[in-house]
């Protein structure tokens, strides 16, 4: 029986709640991860964008980075991280200071700025969120007088669906930021402001984590610089059932036809 493996962090793309990512990215990732069709999946937004640029744009970007003409795309990506991102990743500076530091470097590289600014800042946001995650969880522990452990400690996995003809089953996988006896805990690092609400695309992930762990409650934490907001969120069966319906539509429309 063919295992179709989905990860919790991509479900909102699959269900259509995340409008910012292209569905093709999720299709390729699922096909590759499930070993149905071999695909190359870029490991960062910068790499993804570099692969889509023209040869002329790459040549100019190499010059702006003072790289040799025969430098590989990996070397270009590494130099971008080194020159543009490193100073902006300091967890002790504010989100605005982080952006300003990146902008200062990009000013001197007009082609790189034009082609890669959005991708670079998406990667920067992701990396800063990872770097600040433990600190943000510690702050919540102190503020709410609770313990948050099991931090990214385990890969959870649970079966979502089994095909009646036993051709395939659908598996959901994911790592959780933290957990205690009562909650699964998810933390988000905001770059411009607190939302003071949970967007639907993040509710998909929260319900997925509760489904995998059997917990009935989640604690959603959002952080912006030193400000923090936490909201308790109960498992929403109606919302999750709707997500499951959309997930299976995705699987049947985009994945099952590739199974040999």
Residue map of PLM features:
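Charged, glycine-rich intrinsically disordered N-terminal tails and low-complexity linkers that flank
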Residues: 1-139, 143
């Amino acid at each position: 029986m063919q295992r179709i493996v989905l990860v919790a962090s991509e479900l909102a793309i699959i269900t259509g709640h995340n409008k910012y990512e292209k569905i093709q990215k999720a299709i390729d990732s699922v096909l590759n991860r499930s070993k149905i069709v071999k695909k190359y999946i870029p490991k960062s937004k910068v790499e993804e964008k570099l692969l889509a640029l023209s040869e002329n744009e790459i040549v100019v970007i190499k010059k702006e980075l003072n790289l040799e003409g025969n430098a590989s795309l990996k070397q270009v990506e590494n130099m971008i991280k080194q020159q543009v991102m490193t100073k902006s990743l300091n967890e002790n500076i504010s989100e605005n200071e982080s952006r300003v530091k990146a902008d200062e470097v990009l000013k001197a590289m007009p082609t790189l700025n034009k082609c890669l600014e959005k991708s670079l800042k998406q990667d920067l946001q992701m990396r800063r969120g990872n770097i600040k995650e433990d600190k943000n969880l510690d702050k919540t522990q102190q503020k709410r007088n609770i313990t948050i452990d099991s931090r990214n400690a385990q890969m959870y996995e649970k079966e979502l669906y089994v095909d009646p003809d036993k051709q395939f089953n659908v598996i959901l996988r994911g790592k959780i930021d933290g957990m205690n006896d009562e909650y699964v805990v998810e933390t988000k690092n905001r770059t411009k402001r607190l939302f003071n609400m949970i967007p639907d695309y993040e509710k998909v992930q929260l319900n997925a984590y509760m489904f995998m762990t059997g917990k009935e409650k989640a604690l959603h934490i959002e952080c912006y610089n030193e400000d923090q907001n936490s909201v308790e969120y109960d498992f929403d069966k109606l919302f999750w059932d709707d997500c499951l319906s959309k997930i299976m539509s995705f699987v049947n429309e985009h994945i099952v036809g590739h199974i040999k």
